[in-house]
């Protein structure tokens, strides 16, 4: 993949880099591959969130790097930089990797590391579980794993060492880091983890044993969404929800703090 971007005074920045195709609603994302020139001059859309901003086509990341290798010849791995993949906060219902406070240019230039900030699906689009084997939730966490996969496959071209990735985040990002530590899908994809707050960012929210099961999460998060979309009695609830107006899904479930279930990261 080739990208068109720009540099600031002390680092290069690649904005709005697609790491996954537009995801199927309530389906798991896969890494994006392309040999076409991709513009990386502006941030990609944030993920759909209240009050109705953003898009479901939102799986973009941003790369800030102090060093770009010459990719026309074999890359000197000794010159590659350590990588921080930063996961934004926002209670799993808001925020994006393009929020100004997550701009990684200063850290890249002063810390001599590559900084990656990511979007991931939020609210019901990222975490709504159905109490069946078809749609088990945690699509937002799966997006984070997909971002890790993309970074591992491509970050050398941006000056980063795929074998030296640290995952980090604050608030919901810190919860994500803890969840990824317990996710089999993320094993071996990073070398260090740095949760930068407690589980909620503001106060103690209990132990990891308090993460709900899929059944508990479905009862709390899914019931109001099914009711609002008239999908409660559908033969296939997931198909019904996929056809529903995204704004209706958002308004029904977008303010409910998703209950991340470690169990559902195992599907």
Regions found by a protein language model. Name each.
Residues 1-79, 261:
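Catalytic-loop region of hydrolases
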Residues 20, 228-229, 244:
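Phosphate/oxyanion-binding loops and surfaces in catalytic or ligand/nucleic-acid-binding neighborhoods
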Residues 192, 205, 240-267:
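Substrate-gating cap/lid region and adjacent catalytic-acid/histidine neighborhood
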Residues 16, 50-234:
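Serine-hydrolase-like catalytic core of hydrolytic proteins
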Residues 234-240:
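Flexible, acidic loop-helix segments that line cofactor/substrate-binding pockets
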């Amino acid at each position: 993949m080739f990208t068109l971007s720009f540099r600031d005074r002390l680092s290069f920045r690649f904005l709005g880099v697609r790491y996954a195709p537009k995801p199927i609603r309530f389906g798991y994302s896969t890494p994006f591959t392309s040999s076409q020139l991709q513009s990386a001059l502006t941030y990609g859309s944030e993920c759909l969130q209240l009050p109705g901003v953003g898009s479901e086509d939102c799986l973009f990341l941003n790369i800030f790097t102090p060093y770009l290798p010459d990719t026309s010849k074999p890359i000197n791995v000794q010159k590659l930089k350590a990588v921080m993949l930063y996961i934004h906060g926002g209670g799993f219902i808001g925020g994006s990797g393009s929020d100004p406070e997550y701009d990684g240019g200063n850290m890249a230039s002063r810390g001599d590391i590559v900084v990656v900030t990511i979007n991931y699906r939020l609210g019901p689009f990222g975490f709504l579980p159905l109490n069946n084997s078809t749609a088990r939730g945690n699509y937002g966490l799966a997006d984070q794993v997909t971002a890790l996969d993309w970074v591992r496959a491509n970050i050398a071209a941006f000056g980063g060492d795929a074998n030296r990735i640290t995952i980090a985040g604050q608030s919901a990002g810190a919860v994500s880091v803890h969840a990824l530590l317990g996710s089999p899908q993320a094993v071996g994809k990073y070398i260090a983890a740095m949760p930068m707050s407690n589980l909620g960012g503001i106060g103690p929210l209990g132990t990891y044993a308090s993460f709900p099961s899929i059944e508990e999460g479905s009862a709390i998060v899914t019931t109001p969404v099914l009711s609002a979309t008239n999908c409660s009695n559908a033969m296939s609830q997931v198909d019904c929800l996929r056809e529903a107006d995204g704004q209706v899904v958002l308004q029904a479930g977008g303010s409910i703090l998703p209950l991340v279930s470690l169990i559902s990261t195992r599907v």
